[in-house]
Amino acid sequence: MKTEKDIRYSDISPLDKLDIYFANEEKGVIIYFHGGGFEAGDKYDPHVVEIAESFANFGYTFVNVDYSLYPNTKFPSFLIEAALAVKYIKERFPHQKIYITGTSAGAYISMMLCFNRELLGKHGIKPLDISGWIFESGQPTSHFNLLKFEKGLDPLLQRIDELAPLYYVDKNVLLSKALFILYTDDMPNRYEQNQLMIKAVKNFNPSLQLDQILLEGTHCAGSSIKDNDGLYPYVKKTIEWLER
């Protein structure tokens, strides 16, 4: 499998590098943002690498993106960085479908890119230019660690402000399609938060394709625990959704 590692896509943070896992087919390019609560995680995580290789084996070129983390970042730096990563990939693969996904904190980033239209809009990219969005157990309300680091608040609080993807949902919401992957034993409130997001979007635009899958297990188990067939449920369910 051909790969390109540690491609610098931005000069904002020393962590702003990405890896590309090239597929032999051209089914599309998947841009992935890892989880870790904005304090941890990177593209070298063994699970993340295996996920990248799995998607490439299914015909999707896969992009693992690193971004700045606390305590060496401030909101919205990692969102600006993420938008630059998308810009780089759009320019690198101008004729392929682009999909954006993420796990936990990475799903939060993906949601922000989708619903805060200014982030990608600065680079001439609209949410509709992305062929699909996959959010694995993201937090659509204000992220708990952003409440902690940015506002000094109790991370258990529920807030909808400029730190929340939900804050940007309005009558102009428009996207190709989205998949929400959630878990039966997810983080407290995570299922309910995502139901609120889905219903808020549908309230403005009932015709949008917003699908959801509820998997067995704890928070993001589908991208950290393989099934008996050796594949991650997150990968399998995403592939099924993309190709149906």
Regions found by a protein language model. Name each.
Residues 42-51, 63-97, 228-229:
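Catalytic nucleophile-loop/oxyanion-hole region of alpha/beta-hydrolase
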Residues 204-244:
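C-terminal catalytic histidine-bearing segment of alpha/beta-hydrolase fold enzymes
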Residues 24-54:
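Short, surface-exposed "cap/lid" segments of acyl-processing enzymes
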